Amino acid sequence: MLESLLPRILSNDIQYRLIAFEGKQDLEKQLERRIRGYQNSLARFVILRDLDSHPDCRAVKKNLLGICRLSGKIQFCLVRIACTELETFYLADLAAVGMALQMSRLASHQNNRKFRSPDAIGNPSKELKLITGNRYQKVAGSREIGKYLQLDNARSASFRNLVTGVRRMETELLAIPV
């Protein structure tokens, strides 16, 4: 999702690199080393993780911030947790899902109560598969949907926090004299 979302948020003057991990254990195991090893003094790090089955998003974020602190570069890190899964972001913008999956009528479901506050949906990936008739596929679907997500969508607080944080980092980077 970040692959197709970041170009829509960031200025063309900012180059970025995405590093995918093989699940949350791999992320937690390698994150400190990856951040510490990055030699570019302008590098900033956006760490995005699903909450998955963990009951406490604050504890997950605190743990990741602790790992960032150990790297010595916490001031350059932005940690965001998708409540409960990344699919929550998509359920907050069914028009984007509809465009990505060529399902024009999907947006009409947005006013249903559960889709007005998607961060509260217990199993967003299951809900997304259900509402799309199994047309949504995690990797390909995420990439495609990211192209259409409305950046100012306020239905998902976790999505709004991600976009706001990335924009703040962008502002800080662009203010650094080169």
What positions do the PLM features span?
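C-terminal accessory helical subdomains adjacent to catalytic cores in phosphodiester-
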Residues: 3-19, 25-44, 51-178
